[in-house]
A protein has these predicted regions:
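Buried, small/hydrophobic-residue-enriched core segments of structured protein domains
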Residues: 2-191, 200-212
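Glycine-rich phosphate-binding active-site loops on the catalytic face of alpha/beta enzymes
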Residues: 212-219
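Structural detector of well-ordered beta-strand residues that form the stable sheet scaffold
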Residues: 128-130, 195, 217
Length: 219
């Protein structure tokens, strides 16, 4: 934990050694503390009700090392995991790779349901689907319900192999989430959690917490 205006590190050495280490040390500490501090604010780690937030920032990071180190710092700041699989390989299970499915993956298949089914057949224990590639209520939601029914039929005695969550990544996230929650409950699937992403920060997340999101993705 770092506090404002409180010395974090004191290094005593000769002048040449101090000059050589200064840039690297400051770069490392400043970058990691920047990301970890932002993650703490977003996750509410320092509050009584921390949020479940996944780090998705690698595509916007300033280079590969920043993407990996940023994922590590975000987890230190309270994020539950990262979309960066390389970061998990580098740092181990502490920096867990998590996430849903991409628009590009869904568009690769002949139909949205084909994409959902392929993902579920590959990762039956962690099915989290993106619903807004085409149309949330007219396409994404019906196909999600169809897939969950398929999993129930395929694994009748394994309640862990169900659709875990549904993600919205565009439009009015609050309004869309409210409609989706109502529709899922009406379909008898209250166990499917909501995930929101796209341009979120701590203020937007605070305004959306009324809509019962299980997770947020930021990056």
């Amino acid at each position: 934990v770092a506090y404002p205006h409180v010395q974090m590190v004191r290094i005593e050495c000769d002048l040449v050694g101090a000059i050589l280490i200064e840039t690297y040390l400051l770069q490392t500490m400043n970058f990691h503390s920047l990301i970890a501090t932002k993650a703490t604010r977003v996750t509410g780690l320092n509050t009584h009700t921390p949020r479940s937030v996944m780090e998705f920032g690698t595509r916007r990071a300033q280079g590969e090392s920043a993407g990996n180190d940023g994922a590590y710092a975000a987890v230190l700041g309270g994020c539950i995991g990262t979309a960066n699989c390389l970061a998990e390989m580098k740092f181990g299970a502490e920096v867990k790779a998590v996430g849903t499915v991409a628009h590009s993956f869904i568009e690769f298949f002949p139909t949205e349901f084909d994409a959902f089914k392929a993902f579920a057949d590959t990762y039956p224990d962690s099915v989290s689907l993106l619903l807004d590639t085409y149309n949330i209520m007219e396409s994404g939601l019906p196909n999600l319900i169809k897939l969950d029914d398929y999993l129930i039929e395929k694994y009748p005695n394994d309640p862990n192999r169900r659709v875990k969550s549904a993600r919205i990544d565009s439009g009015d996230l609050a309004r869309g989430s409210k409609r989706l929650r109502k529709a899922l409950d009406a379909a008898g699937k209250p166990y499917i959690k909501l995930v929101a992403s796209n341009g979120l920060d701590e203020k937007k997340i605070a305004n959306m917490e009324l809509y019962e999101h299980a997770h947020f993705e930021i990056g």
